Swiss-Prot record:
Matches recorded under Pfam families: Ribosomal_L34
PROSITE patterns documented for this protein: RIBOSOMAL_L34
GO molecular-function term, one example from the UniProt record: structural constituent of ribosome
A biological-process GO annotation: translation
Record's keyword annotation contains Protein biosynthesis: no
Highest taxon of the lineage: Bacteria
NCBIfam families: rpmH_bact
Protein name: Large ribosomal subunit protein bL34
HAMAP family the record matches: Ribosomal_bL34
């Protein structure tokens, strides 16, 4: 049976990367929450 997760770095960056997050208001909110929490890595 084929697994559902077939990792691809480009797709990962495009979907969950910093620039993708900054593109939308909700994405910027995610980054701000993660900054407030003190996350070492903000995005994928």
């Amino acid at each position: 049976m084929k697994r559902t997760f077939q990792p691809k770095n480009l797709k990962r960056k495009r979907t969950h990367g910093f620039r993708a997050r900054m593109r939308t208001q909700g994405g910027r909110a995610i980054i701000n929450r993660r900054r407030a929490k003190g996350r070492k890595r903000l995005t994928a």
